[in-house]
């Protein structure tokens, strides 16, 4: 049995897949993206988060059975609203065996995997066998830029994108728009060229920058010094995708 660590469980979410969903946020991520909007999901261990109102511990351990029981209790309302369960993070691939065990215990619920794609191929394939839809985050195509802004190269991510396409599990590409970093015309055009012919692609979802990230870092006692100007408006250049016939939406 593989126990997992969760930093949040959000009920009645509407942006993490079809219908009304429960989103499970797994703790721990191999990337260190500047401006991550869930910094409480970066560490694999529990952390204390402080605010003016309270101090609380973020990171709860669950067995697969415990989490499955909780999710199955919600199954009737999720199914009635054409929804299901979404596993997000952090990075679910870091806890792939735990996630797989939980999915195997669910009562025929629709499952979405939200991933950066940064993980072992065998772990990704194991989860692809169990999910109905994938939300795949794609930030930067240029390798050196990816290293600079996330702390890791993107070779594994781009490889797993091909693995995903070959699996024929339908997927959505999510692009977090960080001002001056991921929202440039060069980067968005490169993403469009990379994905335009991939089987299984449903559409691209552009996600404008979340300016609340800085407050979360401070509450966790973490430094937040972005090299970009977070006050700048993001460039939503949907035409980069339109020109290549790629369906695009903006969150």
Where are these regions (language model features)?
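N-terminal [4Fe-4S]-dependent radical SAM core
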Residues: 1-63, 73-81
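Conserved AdoMet/S-adenosylmethionine-binding subsite of the radical SAM
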Residues: 68-212, 218
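Short, flexible micro-motifs
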Residues: 20-22, 31, 38, 92-93, ...
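Generic domain-boundary/flexible-linker signal
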Residues: 17, 35, 44-47, 96, ...
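Auxiliary Fe-S-binding modules of radical SAM enzymes
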Residues: 1-18, 179-251
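Short glycine-enriched, charge-decorated loop/helix-capping segments at active-site entrances
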Residues: 53-57, 147-153, 220-227
């Amino acid at each position: 049995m593989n126990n997992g660590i969760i930093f949040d469980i959000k009920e009645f979410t509407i942006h993490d897949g079809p219908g009304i969903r429960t989103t499970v946020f797994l703790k721990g991520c191999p990337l260190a993206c500047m401006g991550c909007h869930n910094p409480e999901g970066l560490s694999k261990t529990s952390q204390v988060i402080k605010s003016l109102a309270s101090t609380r511990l973020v990171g709860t351990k669950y067995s697969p059975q415990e989490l499955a029981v909780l999710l199955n209790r919600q199954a009737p309302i999720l199914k009635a609203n054409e929804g299901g369960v979404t596993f997000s993070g952090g990075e679910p691939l870091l806890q792939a065996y735990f996630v797989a065990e939980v999915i195997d215990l669910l009562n025929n619920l629709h499952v979405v995997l939200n991933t950066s794609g940064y993980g072992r191929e065998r772990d990704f394939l194991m989860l692809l066998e169990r999910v109905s839809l994938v939300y795949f985050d794609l930030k930067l195509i240029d390798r050196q830029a990816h290293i600079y802004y996330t702390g890791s190269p993107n070779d594994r991510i781009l490889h797993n994108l091909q693995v995903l396409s070959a699996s024929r599990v339908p997927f959505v590409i999510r692009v977090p728009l960080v001002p001056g970093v991921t929202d440039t015309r060069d980067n968005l055009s490169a993403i469009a060229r990379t994905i335009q012919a991939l089987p299984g692609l449903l559409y691209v979802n552009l996600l404008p920058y979340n300016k609340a990230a800085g407050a979360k870092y401070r509450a966790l006692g973490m430094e937040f010094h972005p090299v970009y100007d977070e006050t700048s408006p993001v460039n939503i250049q949907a035409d980069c995708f339109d020109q290549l016939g790629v369906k695009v939406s903006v969150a």
